[in-house]
């Protein structure tokens, strides 16, 4: 019996010892290939993979299936960050999209298929529903010829050109970089070294598929980075998740900086140092800190449901400056309508260079101006049917008080 495949907020995820099998990957990529050949016949599709075991093998399978549908499938020649693959598709006029095989920020044993459209955005709900509805029950055994390419050099030049290289070089900074064994290893560290930054890279030359670390840039998984920053006397620790579309950070005192604070700093850099304007798009779960700062900087805030695909859809309308989710994904519209953890790290370095202040001082200044905020998150793992039941029940849950205080509002977005 074939598995029922449902896409989540950012692609299809399953355990390698469960539903993430050769047959199911072939089924998903067959549906993608048929869709794109119908809407974009003969166009280019980039296929990438990260450092997880078997990611490369599944990417080779996917590229062959995509090519069998008459599309120009391009398989990357080495592990790449998802933002690099997305950028390659977005800036290739002949490309209709990209497909990434990655463990992303998920624990050991998981792999995902992330789908990106030709403009770099996450696939919208209409595309997802068509894929799910037209997916074959069994793989068709299709395999075509694909080509390979190294997309990294062009991507590295592009993100480096986005920041003020002279300011960063003049600052003579020291940072710790933690790619968490993921796809950014070597790339972010090398970029910063080329910009004159002294870098201590940890969790490099490793895989994210290990039991002692989850490649999610939050506590407790950033503990090693926190220690390294203090021991090295660095001005910051820069952390990316398994496929480098999310960012985490540590200040010079070894304190974890939550994603809302990072987005606030990035927003400040874009407005105050680049004189850029536009709407700021955030998920419902994003902190009020970002909203306060955006309004103070004269930017209108747009709130969307959880899932970056909703933010990307708003970015594609135009007039958006930046979009961010509470999990550390930050997308800058002038770059592409998708998250890029590597670019976000470079912008933090640029901000520290221009202000002459380490990360902790910048956060202290934020809190002095806009108040101190706290944020906590607890994930709950549910089976698909249980999650659907919860979605049905939640609209009827409207608490009159929480910890003795009345909620200002309740949203079921």
Q: What does each of the following model-derived ranges do?
A:
Residues 124, 201-203, 255-274, 341-350:
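Gly/Ser/Thr-rich active-site loops/lids in small-molecule metabolic enzymes
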Residues 115-118, 248-252, 332-333:
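Short beta-strand-to-turn element immediately C-terminal to the catalytic PLP-Schiff-base lysine
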Residues 1-2, 19, 111-232:
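Gly/Ser/Thr-enriched, mixed-charge loops and adjacent short helices
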Residues 1-69, 145-175:
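An N-terminal, well-structured beta->alpha segment
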Residues 77, 130-157, 252-324, 331-332:
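Proline/glycine-rich low-complexity loops and linkers
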Residues 34, 44-110, 191-250:
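N-terminal small/polar loop signature for handling phosphorylated ligands or for N-terminal nucleophile
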Residues 236, 276-413:
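Phosphate-binding and adjacent anionic-ligand microenvironments
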